[in-house]
Amino acid sequence: MTIALGKFTKDEKDLFDIMDDWLRRDRFVFVGWSGLLLFPCAYFALGGWFTGTTFVTSWYTHGLASSYLEGCNFLTAAVSTPANSLAHSLLLLWGPEAQGDFTRWCQLGGLWTFVALHGAFALIGFMLRQFELARSVQLRPYNAIAFSGPIAVFVSVFLIYPLGQSGWFFAPSFGVAAIFRFILFFQGFHNWTLNPFHMMGVAGVLGAALLCAIHGATVENTLFEDGDGANTFRAFNPTQAEETYSMVTANRFWSQIFGVAFSNKRWLHFFMLFVPVTGLWMSALGVVGLALNLRAYDFVSQEIRAAEDPEFETFYTKNILLNEGIRAWMAAQDQPHENLIFPEEVLPRGNAL
């Protein structure tokens, strides 16, 4: 019995092969199979956001002006979430809420679900694009793995959190000031800054910034003089075979500064990948917990003592009172349909006031 080993070749190209050749052709902007998801979704998400911030009011959903047409600027314009009464409706243009009326669809907040869903798929398409290109040029897929961090944060904040609450209403609106207000909401209603997952996220993001600054400075400090150029960018040939900077010198420097240093480039760069991506994933997990109304750290003993002893107060008890004030003010403003009324005497006052 004879077994022939070799690559199977087809006599004719089928439709898939033709599509594959065209999509993955070497061109200025790579398209690829991932581009079939990325480019349309990114186009619709950005187009929806620009349309909403330019023309669409939030009067019917939040009682607010939110467009350039109404006098907002770049920092205050937003594509606002649908009203609380619409719960988790997808708000399809042809759905029972808008019934094909584009103006009514915009008034109800349909652009928010449109931008959120297309934005999520666009981000996923961008990650798949990195996978596809890495496979094409035989690279490892760590760029795509790193980009999973921002995707996890986006999906957890804009989709999973409101799904755990009563509706899309409680997700962030797509705007700068709107995101700031959402952060205040997270603090007031979830005590987010005292959540251990938030702490890990802050450590990851700020730690990554520190690592980038240290790494960039160290490389600049230990560059070899490979040429007589006037600055860093002209002093070496981009196609040179030898190293650009001295890892040995950098290792000796940081060993003297800290007593420890990275011994090789692989471990150094893996650590620079690990710190921010892990921080983003931890933040995303924390937001998933908030969707289920899981609580942050509670120091009840301090709260009880502050309630009993007029002279005892900590930064923690002051922050708890601040959170109560945020809830009292924001709930009445954000949820007028609940007819919430908080008399002056029930608003929180700290012992120091």
Swiss-Prot record:
Reaction catalysed by this enzyme: 2 a plastoquinone + 4 hnu + 2 H2O = 2 a plastoquinol + O2
Primary location: plastid
Binding site for pheophytin a: Q130, N143
Modified residue annotations for N-acetylthreonine: T2
Intracellular or extracellular location(s): Plastid, Chloroplast thylakoid membrane
Membrane topology according to the record: Multi-pass membrane protein
GO cellular component: chloroplast thylakoid membrane; photosystem II
A Pfam entry, by short name: Photo_RC
Residues annotated as binding Fe cation: H215, H269
GO BP terms, alphabetized: photosynthetic electron transport in photosystem II
EC number annotated for this UniProt entry: 1.10.3.9
Family designation: Belongs to the reaction center PufL/M/PsbA/D family.
Role noted for this protein: Photosystem II (PSII) is a light-driven water:plastoquinone oxidoreductase that uses light energy to abstract electrons from H(2)O, generating O(2) and a proton gradient subsequently used for ATP formation. It consists of a core antenna complex that captures photons, and an electron transfer chain that converts photonic excitation into a charge separation. The D1/D2 (PsbA/PsbD) reaction center heterodimer binds P680, the primary electron donor of PSII as well as several subsequent electron acceptors. D2 is needed for assembly of a stable PSII complex.
UniProt name for this protein: Photosystem II D2 protein
Protein source organism: Aethionema cordifolium
Origin organism lineage: Eukaryota, Viridiplantae, Streptophyta, Embryophyta, Tracheophyta
